[in-house]
Amino acid sequence: MSEEKDTPLEAFASLKHSGVTPQKVRRIVDLIRGRSVDEALAILRFSPHSASGILYKLIVSAQANYANLLGRDDDLFVSSVYVDEGKTYKRGRPRARGSSSRILKRGSHVTVTLSKEVR
């Protein structure tokens, strides 16, 4: 009998406590979900949004994690990407008559999963 190794079919990379708001990151995430890694990296490279650089580095990191686990680099797809809300910092802005209004500085957590097949 020959034993088959359980090869991991997925590789993960996550970013916690990002300073970009979840709304801005989700706008870019919807463009790359379900695409091949090469196609997703090309989209992110030429996208003018601030979240593009963060997602670009995150996908490259997940690709390196996959290559490190298996020792080879296959044609991978972005099978799932999700953005969760991180910590919200509350700041005040001076207003008229000595009052102030609240400003919310939102953060996000991003997780990328690469696999050989799209779910």
From Swiss-Prot:
UniProt xrefs under PROSITE patterns: RIBOSOMAL_L22 (PS00464)
One Pfam family named in its UniProt record: Ribosomal_L22
GO biological process, one term: translation
Keywords: Ribonucleoprotein, Ribosomal protein, RNA-binding, rRNA-binding
GO CC terms of this entry: cytosolic large ribosomal subunit
InterPro entries assigned to the protein according to its UniProt record, in alphabetical order: Ribosomal_uL22, Ribosomal_uL22_bac/chlpt-type, Ribosomal_uL22_bac/org-type, Ribosomal_uL22_CS, Ribosomal_uL22_sf
Subunit structure, interactors included: Part of the 50S ribosomal subunit.
Described function: This protein binds specifically to 23S rRNA; its binding is stimulated by other ribosomal proteins, e.g. L4, L17, and L20. It is important during the early stages of 50S assembly. It makes multiple contacts with different domains of the 23S rRNA in the assembled 50S subunit and ribosome.
Family assignment from sequence similarity: Belongs to the universal ribosomal protein uL22 family.
Protein name, per record: Large ribosomal subunit protein uL22
Organism: Tropheryma whipplei (strain Twist)
